[in-house]
């Protein structure tokens, strides 16, 4: 179901792309996957205050390219680029290959699901009321162009004894629609009462596919195959020859007799009656009473 499954994984083959893009055979796949997880955990701890939205890992031939999407690129780069150089050395040591690190700026962090979740968890750790933090984030997202947003918080909210779950939604969030561009992010708040989990769904509109445009091509083909339908039945005129009179009009009387004007006959037969010559049988001459022959 669309409400239960991860929205990113649900749309991977349609409108989303993978966050790790490389190929490995069966022997090397597990090791490379473990390296990716290790790198992501390291960047999560190292760049905790840099507002990192997502990390893209690519592995061309015997190299690695890591793209970091951040709302605060200056924190990642550091003074005169010192921090990013140290980051490259550490990542190269972990992966064992040369690493190129690229920084991409997130223009609107208010409508990025991961950054919204991180912002709410930071406020929860500062003992701000969870309802106030959630509603403020929703207002900012809708104000900056999001078509819909849903936020869910789970755990010992406000320090209550029994954990519960609360969620709020504004706008529309169509999780079942595959062409819908749904941004999904999660985060955890480490509070004195325990962990509070935050999930965020942001609806940004419909998309026509990934960067290669395969989704747009599929939609165009489907539209061409769809044949146009004719007008509605009640919009057609009622004076067609193969149809009767309009609805509500008086009907002509029916009977077994033929019409007097010959309208039931073909046009040629009806017109031929005017030029026909009537045949009159000539009567035989009457015989004489005395039986004599007349000349």
From Swiss-Prot:
Residues 39-107 form the KH type-2 domain. GO terms for cellular component: cytosolic small ribosomal subunit. Residues 224-245 have a biased composition (Basic and acidic residues). CDD domains: KH-II_30S_S3. It comes from the Bacteria. GO terms for molecular function: mRNA binding; rRNA binding; structural constituent of ribosome. Keywords: Ribonucleoprotein, Ribosomal protein, RNA-binding, rRNA-binding. Residues 246-255, 283-295 have a biased composition (Low complexity). The keyword rRNA-binding applies. Residues 213-295 are annotated as: Disordered. GO terms for biological process: translation. Part of the 30S ribosomal subunit. Forms a tight complex with proteins S10 and S14. Belongs to the universal ribosomal protein uS3 family. Binds the lower part of the 30S subunit head. Binds mRNA in the 70S ribosome, positioning it for translation. This is Small ribosomal subunit protein uS3. It comes from Polaromonas naphthalenivorans (strain CJ2).
């Amino acid at each position: 179901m669309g409400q239960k499954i991860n929205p990113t994984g649900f749309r991977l083959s349609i409108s989303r792309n993978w966050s790790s893009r490389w190929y490995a055979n069966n022997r090397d796949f597990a090791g490379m996957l473990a390296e990716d997880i290790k790198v992501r955990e390291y960047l999560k701890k190292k760049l905790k205050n840099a507002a990192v939205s997502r990390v893209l890992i690519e592995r061309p031939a015997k190299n690695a390219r890591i793209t970091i999407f951040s709302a605060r690129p200056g924190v990642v780069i550091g003074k005169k680029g010192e921090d990013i150089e140290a980051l490259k050395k550490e990542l190269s040591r972990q992966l064992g290959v040369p690493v190129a690190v690229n920084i991409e700026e997130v223009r609107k962090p208010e409508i990025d699901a991961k950054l919204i979740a991180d912002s709410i968890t930071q406020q929860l750790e500062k003992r701000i009321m969870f309802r106030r933090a959630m509603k403020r984030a929703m207002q900012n997202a809708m104000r900056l162009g999001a078509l819909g947003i849903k936020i869910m918080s789970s755990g010992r909210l406000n320090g209550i004894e029994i954990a519960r779950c609360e969620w709020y939604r504004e706008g529309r969030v169509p999780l079942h629609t595959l062409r819908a561009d749904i941004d999904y992010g999660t985060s955890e708040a480490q509070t004195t009462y325990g962990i509070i989990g935050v999930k965020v769904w942001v609806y940004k509109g419909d998309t026509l596919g990934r960067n290669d445009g395969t989704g747009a091509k599929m939609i165009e083909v489907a539209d061409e195959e769809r044949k146009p339908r004719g007008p509605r039945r009640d919009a057609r005129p009622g004076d067609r020859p193969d149809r009767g009179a309009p609805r509500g009009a008086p009907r002509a009387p029916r009977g077994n007799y033929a019409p007097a004007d010959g309208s039931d006959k073909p046009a040629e037969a009806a017109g031929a009656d005017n030029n026909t010559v009537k045949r009159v049988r000539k009567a035989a001459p009457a015989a004489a009473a005395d039986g004599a022959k007349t000349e």
